[in-house]
Curated annotation (Swiss-Prot):
Keywords for the protein's UniProt record, in alphabetical order: Activator, Arginine metabolism, Cytoplasm, DNA-binding, Transcription, Transcription regulation
Family under the similarity heading: Belongs to the ArgR family.
Coiled coil feature spans: none
Protein name as annotated: Arginine regulator
Organism (species): Streptococcus suis
């Protein structure tokens, strides 16, 4: 584990152990544990770890955001907004058509997301074939992927 990963693990364990109200308090706890960090680095760490402040009993403290999208979900949403041409379930598969040259990027993102219904992705230049175990799995996968498309994508003209 490298230095950044170790620091992130320590931050997460500190957040889970006790209520930390300020960045300065977190910075001091890191110091006690032998990790010296600047405020700007700590601020970036907080953002990377999806930590948010919640209000409770007239004070606020840091928690891990339970509904924060993963970086792969963010990336998929961006790709869907910029490069998706078609998304359609067909039997036990979902066909994802993209702008030329981007199908492999979609396939890599989908593989990294480890969506349970996806058995495999096979990609060409502008088509990513998403293979599922059965028709129900393909429909569930399609419904899951639809949530990453722009709001207007499936609207009727």
């Amino acid at each position: 584990m490298n230095k950044i990963e170790s620091r992130h693990q320590l931050i997460l364990s500190l957040i889970m152990e006790k209520k930390i109200h300020t960045q300065q308090e977190l910075q001091e706890l890191l110091e006690v544990n032998g990790v010296s960090v600047t405020q700007s680095t700590l601020s970036r760490d907080i953002k990377m770890l999806n930590l948010v402040k919640v209000n409770e009993d007239d004070s606020s403290h840091y928690v891990i955001n339970p509904i924060a999208p993963t970086r792969w979900e963010k990336r998929l949403r961006l790709y869907m907004e910029d490069a998706l041409v078609m998304l359609k379930p067909i039997q036990h598969q979902v066909v994802l058509k993209t702008l030329p040259g981007l199908a492999n990027s979609f396939g890599s993102i989908l593989d990294a997301m480890e969506i349970p219904q996806i058995v495999a992705t096979v990609c060409g230049d502008d088509v990513c074939l998403i293979i599922c175990e059965d028709v129900e799995g393909a429909q569930a996968c399609f419904e899951h992927l639809k949530q990453f498309t722009p709001p207007f994508f499936f609207s009727k003209l």
